[in-house]
Curated annotation (Swiss-Prot):
The gene is rpsU. The keyword Membrane does not apply. Keywords: Ribonucleoprotein, Ribosomal protein. GO terms for biological process: translation. InterPro entries: Ribosomal_bS21, Ribosomal_bS21_CS, Ribosomal_bS21_sf. Belongs to the bacterial ribosomal protein bS21 family. This is Small ribosomal subunit protein bS21. Pfam families: Ribosomal_S21 (PF01165). One of its GO terms (molecular function) is structural constituent of ribosome. One of its GO terms (cellular component) is ribonucleoprotein complex.
């Protein structure tokens, strides 16, 4: 469970920002969104393969 202690005289916006950062680091929302619907293993593999190809293409573009 993610807990954020609100300090004395700290604006709630700042505490909320720290809470959101902690959630992003733990990748809670990403996992919840991915589990919302069932995706077949073949589709997962296809998406991972396309993502790897895309990353490789970007790396080649950066290196020249």
């Amino acid at each position: 469970m993610i807990v954020v202690q609100v300090k004395d005289n700290e604006p709630i916006e700042r505490a909320l920002k720290r809470f959101k950062k902690k959630i992003d680091r733990v990748k809670v929302l990403k996992e919840v969104k991915s589990r919302r619907y069932y995706t077949k293993p073949s589709i997962k593999r296809r998406e991972e393969k396309l993502k790897a190809i895309y990353k490789q293409h970007l790396q080649q573009q950066a290196n020249g």
